[in-house]
Curated annotation (Swiss-Prot):
<dbReference type="InterPro" id="IPR013805">
    <property type="entry name" value="GrpE_coiled_coil"/>
</dbReference>
<dbReference type="GO" id="GO:0051082">
    <property type="term" value="F:unfolded protein binding"/>
</dbReference>
<dbReference type="InterPro" id="IPR009012">
    <property type="entry name" value="GrpE_head"/>
</dbReference>
<feature type="compositionally biased region" description="Basic and acidic residues">
    <location>
        <begin position="1"/>
        <end position="20"/>
    </location>
</feature>
<dbReference type="GO" id="GO:0000774">
    <property type="term" value="F:adenyl-nucleotide exchange factor activity"/>
</dbReference>
<keyword id="KW-0346">Stress response</keyword>
<keyword id="KW-0963">Cytoplasm</keyword>
<keyword id="KW-0143">Chaperone</keyword>
<dbReference type="GO" id="GO:0006457">
    <property type="term" value="P:protein folding"/>
</dbReference>
<dbReference type="GO" id="GO:0042803">
    <property type="term" value="F:protein homodimerization activity"/>
</dbReference>
<comment type="subunit">
    <text>Homodimer.</text>
</comment>
<comment type="similarity">
    <text>Belongs to the GrpE family.</text>
</comment>
<protein>
    <recommendedName>
        <fullName>Protein GrpE</fullName>
    </recommendedName>
</protein>
<feature type="compositionally biased region" description="Acidic residues">
    <location>
        <begin position="25"/>
        <end position="34"/>
    </location>
</feature>
<dbReference type="GO" id="GO:0051087">
    <property type="term" value="F:protein-folding chaperone binding"/>
</dbReference>
<feature type="region of interest" description="Disordered">
    <location>
        <begin position="1"/>
        <end position="39"/>
    </location>
</feature>
<dbReference type="Pfam" id="PF01025">
    <property type="entry name" value="GrpE"/>
</dbReference>
Length: 192
């Protein structure tokens, strides 16, 4: 019986050892699975963080691309405007000379020498106007037209029954446009 007891004790010891080994293996597995889970969670956090950064970077890139496209469009428009209005400075400088030509041509010619001088001035005046017309310069029509503050500068007001209300009655100085831009507004007298 003693042998039997010893054998039972041995079997119990072995079972305890096996149980301890199994428990150790199970606890190692659970530790590994906890570690794996926490490692997986860390990796997922990292992936989420990187995806957020990627999304932010893509958004920033799209905004920069749109800004660059707008910049290119603006530069192109500025270039076209510069080309379109390249003669503006020159035309502005020539306008006083044209005004003086017009005033000089209004003088009455008393003799043949004066008449030929006026004819020469008229030819030069017409050539200047033709050159300016080729560049897109045109005189602003004023007398009889409705007053337009973009094209006319009112220097006087009168009451005249021959004209409509707010119509230009008289032009003191011609106005000019280059293409669609007013270079100098017409100085006018306006009916009330």
């Amino acid at each position: 019986m003693e042998e039997r007891n010893e054998q039972v004790v041995e079997e119990v010891k072995e079972e305890v050892k096996e149980a301890q080994v199994e428990e150790a293996v199970t606890s190692e597995d659970s530790e590994e699975s906890v570690e794996e889970k926490s490692e997986a969670a860390l990796l997922q956090e990292k992936v989420d963080e990187l995806q957020a950064k990627l999304t932010e970077t893509e958004g920033r890139m799209l905004r920069l691309q749109a800004d660059f496209e707008n910049y290119k469009r603006r530069v192109q428009m500025d270039k076209q405007a510069a080309e379109k209005y390249r003669a503006q400075s020159l035309v502005s400088d020539i306008l006083p000379a044209l005004d003086n030509f017009e005033r000089a041509m209004q003088v009455e010619a008393n003799d043949e020498q004066m008449k030929s001088l006026l004819q020469g001035m008229e030819m030069v005046y017409r050539q200047l106007l033709e050159a300016m017309t080729k560049e897109g310069v045109e005189a602003i029509e004023a007398v009889g037209k409705q007053f337009d503050p973009h094209e006319h500068q009112a220097v006087m007001q009168v009451e005249d029954s021959e004209f409509e209300s707010n119509a230009v009655v008289e032009e003191f100085q011609k106005g000019y446009k280059l293409k669609d831009r007013v270079i100098r507004p017409s100085m006018v007298k306006v009916n009330q």
